[in-house]
């Protein structure tokens, strides 16, 4: 699913839940604003938690040894921060329901 398909799906869900009209343009603006806010907060080193869905945060990736793909020479890859997502319980259960 790409962003356009997500906007379409969210528009349909929102119309169901709100019982009133909402445009794809409005939904696109809200989704874009939410994504921008999440990226800004995580870039500042803070964690964003959406209960049930999951959390976004920046994690430290340690310095490690790697190889130059062109020459095969060993090289040191410096430590860096990377964005990370951890799925919440409700999300995990939706993807892989527990069998009882």
From Swiss-Prot:
Disulfide bonds: none annotated. It comes from Synechocystis sp. (strain ATCC 27184 / PCC 6803 / Kazusa). GO terms for biological process: chromosome condensation. Histone-like DNA-binding protein which is capable of wrapping DNA to stabilize it, and thus to prevent its denaturation under extreme environmental conditions. InterPro entries: Hist_DNA-bd, Histone-like_DNA-bd_CS, IHF-like_DNA-bd_dom_sf. This is DNA-binding protein HU. One of its GO terms (molecular function) is structural constituent of chromatin. One of its GO terms (cellular component) is cytosol. SUPFAM superfamilies: IHF-like DNA-binding proteins. It comes from the Bacteria. Belongs to the bacterial histone-like protein family. Keywords: DNA condensation, DNA-binding.
């Amino acid at each position: 699913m790409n962003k356009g398909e997500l906007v379409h799906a969210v528009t349909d869900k929102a119309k169901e839940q709100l019982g009133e009209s909402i445009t794809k343009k409005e939904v696109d603006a809200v989704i874009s604003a939410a994504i921008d806010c999440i990226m800004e907060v995580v870039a500042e080193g803070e964690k964003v938690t959406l209960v049930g869905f999951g959390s976004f945060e920046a994690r430290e990736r340690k310095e490690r040894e790697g190889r130059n793909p062109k020459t095969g020479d060993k090289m040191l890859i410096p430590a860096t921060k990377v964005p990370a997502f951890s799925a919440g319980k409700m999300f995990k259960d939706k993807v892989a329901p527990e069998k009882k």
